[in-house]
Amino acid sequence: MKKTTLLSLCFACLLGLPLRAEVVPTDTVPFELGADKRLYVTVYINGQDDRPLRFLLDTGATDVVLNSNSPRTEGLAAFTESVENNSVNSVETIPSTESSQVVRMGSRAISGLKLIAIPYPPDAWDGVLGLSYLRNFDVRIDYRRKSIFLYELGDGQKAASDKAVRLKMDYRLGVPVVPVGVRVGGVDYLVSVGVDTGSDRVFDLNTPFVRRNGLLGTQKPFAISRIAGTVKDGGELQNVYFDSVILGDALTLPRIPGAFSTVTTGVQASDAMDGVLGNNFLQRFNQLYDFKNDSLYLEVNDRLYTPFYDFLVR
């Protein structure tokens, strides 16, 4: 009898404990993991539901982009205006629409957006889903489920894992920037770096930072990359190893392949930020973009030990 009473009391105590409320996303959208390891989603423009488009998910893009070379985007929008575009390696004036377009991913349509047109290769993708759409939500990227979870602004932080590292987001050149520690050649630096899921790179330090700290020539590059943003001849990156990358107070990643930029035009030539984290780094984490509270949560996933470059493990 005593045993029964004790169990009943324990059960009653458990019932009285406050439970962490589960936040429900407003939508869950599957993504395709491309051969380039970047994220691709299905997007619809201006109510054309019979014309599904393959878009690159890009936290490094301020706007939504249509690929003007894709036959699938023809006639979807009228490009009657123009804007100045800062790409990774150039600054150009490109066509844009009025701010009256409708963009939908999953069930969530956002109206009043501007679209810009960039002539990517026809078979690259149909467009780029940038921040003008994404910042209407808190956004969680889950690689295990291969899904993107959209939350009402302010609800995202409730979905953050207790194991995630939280980084404070700022904005430079219109894109999110976070503080990261990096050790190069035995010297520690605290850098502000862009967060760019649209980049297939790992971790590039911008030209002004490289010059200011005299980094060129301090290591022999293991490879040279010649990048092409929206122009064909985009400049050079010297690929080297960073001793380590430090995220927050809890996570240190040793021997990360990074790069010293020598690009002289565009984002990587800008001193507005010290460098850029690309998707080849970010894919190792489930990511939660709390746009309401300007925070990025990074949770290690099962892609942590995915090779950065195949040629490095052959």
Predicted regions and their residues:
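Short, composition-biased linear "edge" segments at structural boundaries
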Residues: 2-3, 17-19
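Bacterial N-terminal signal peptides
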Residues: 8-16
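Pepsin/retropepsin-fold aspartyl endopeptidases
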Residues: 21-314
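Bacterial N-terminal signal peptides that target proteins for export
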Residues: 1-9
